[in-house]
């Protein structure tokens, strides 16, 4: 378990955020299972980067595989189990885990913009169109070559 931001079971990641959250990259070897303590005040979701396995345990275990997303209900643990065999492209069950304290605010979305009200979305669109979001040089982001 690599904690990227926030805190998981007393381990703190290097990333910072404006709201309480936890983000981790979890690697589960074939046939293994991990039970991760989770803040019961946080929501949680898991996105599978590679491999296949299950989320949850017992009667609540659900199958999940590459590019699928699981949204968890309330609770204080997240259980991830890797299938005993993985496909030839991966050696493990790789999961991006994230969650945080729900902000319980109105959300308005239009295209890639998400704000708290319609006026906020309109302002974000205008800011983007006028170049106020800044500039990323073409060579600043290197492609992922997994």
Predicted features along the sequence, with ranges:
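Jelly-roll (double-stranded beta-helix
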Residues: 1-146
